[in-house]
Amino acid sequence: YKYAEVNDVIQKFNNIVIGEISNFTEKKSVTHFEYKKGNKKNFVEDQRNILSIAEKIRRNFKRVFIFSIGGSNLGPSLMNDIFNKNDLEIIFITGSDPDEYSSIQIQEDDALVISSKSFGTLETLSSYKEVCGNNFYHNSFAITANKSKALDFGIHEENIISFDSSTGGRFSIWSPINLVLCLLEGEKGYKDFLQGGKEMDDACLKIPEDNPAFQLSVQDIIYNNLLNVETTLVMNYDYKLRNFISFSQQVEMESNGKSIDSNNNKVDYQTGSIIWGGYGPESQHSFFQHVFQGTKQSNKYFICSRSDKLNY
């Protein structure tokens, strides 16, 4: 707990949550917390808009194609894994390789969602054009922080979902980028998710003795800097979380993948570790011999569901 006191960790996190400048390069605050708080007008309006459009899509379309990559894809795709009970077919297209989408035939009852913060992501926009051409703008929706570019592209204004430009891509699951959750769980599920996120934020502001997130974070720092263990293994034993590793890699490695501090000074310590892992039952039959009998050490997290559902 001395580490927290000396480095003022809890207060620094609180400063980020309340909206103080944390991106010193662009002189911006971090705003994804505002969607969880739900007490600022423009953020509440964004949420009303996403719920309204989600209802419109559920009522009028049979399939949903989401053109997205990176932070606009990883979180929503994880939500689809967790919450989709096969009532709505949702197909993600990253646009990274034509083989991903070359066989797709768009129908009139398909909803087409372009999800891009900048609305300038090459893979996202080019794959939409390849798949849809210029024939389906009436079925198309945009989720973006750059409304003018979406309008110029041809998306109808009433089909554009805006969100704040200071919401980082790796945290955009808390923003309207998370249309998927609204489609699958409706208003109550969406609000419950945000409330859960806020409760975790509040827990992270508690004193170190009552703060599990802080304690685990210090453990990671000790492994990485004192014990020279450079990788963190994340294993999931719940099928719905089988792709959680991809989401967690972005959240941690994009956030902490730095070699300079907030004042642009070169650091003399290790920052984030390398995150890897997978779905437990599959991984046990691929790389677990290395984990248990190999010469490399890793900081290990095992995530399980409360009920044992595994078929041994």
Model-derived regions: residue spans:
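A short acidic, often aromatic-flanked loop/helix-cap motif at beta-alpha or helix-coil junctions
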Residues: 3-7, 98-99, 166-172, 282-284, ...
